[in-house]
Amino acid sequence: MRNPWLDIPEADYLGHMSSPTVGQRPVLGRLLGEVLETVRPNVVLVLGGSTGNGLEHVNPTITSRVVVVDVNPKYLIRLRERFPNPAFELDLWCGDVIEIGLGRQVFDLVHAGLIFEYVEWPVLLPRIAAALRPGGVLNVILQAPSASSPAVTPTPYSSLRKLESLFRFVEPTALVDAARGEGLNLHARHTEALPAGKSFDGFRFIKDAV
């Protein structure tokens, strides 16, 4: 089955995420910036990084390398155009986050913003845990269910409707329990309000130190 993300034009995705009724793009960028500032990681992995929203917050005096994974090659081409000569090493990996090799004990921070809803996250989570260094941080942003708005908010960018068949809400308790089983302990949790009655749930996990 073809991944629906491959059929979402960059302009549609950016327009949808930035539209007043969705308003998720600026929030996601800010949240990445906040975790970069708090964790101060040397090596970072961004899953589902799209066109690089939030990478403008990378401080190259602290972070020497950023790896971005996305399934859509056109998004990564645009990301490279946005950051042609960054002051940090920027590696772009195109592929499915479930299948692509992440390595072992490579990263100080793994950021997963609105990615778990679109993949088999119980399969991805152990791979993330293995890729984190001891004491490393997993930062997860989930979309919380809303009583007043569908999972994919209607906008003029109709191609986004293709994602409805892929989207699955993640039950927070299940995530926290599964993370604990992988040696990832919940350190902080917070809620971010969004337009149209939606909200994000943010989770920060720390990997057991050896």
Predicted segments, located by residue:
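Conserved class I S-adenosyl-L-methionine
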Residues: 137-170
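A short acidic, Gly/Pro-enriched loop at the edge of an enzyme's catalytic core
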Residues: 98-110
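Short alpha-helix
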Residues: 164-183
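Class I SAM-dependent methyltransferase Rossmann-like catalytic core
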Residues: 1-39
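Class I SAM-dependent methyltransferase SAM/SAH-binding core
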Residues: 43-100
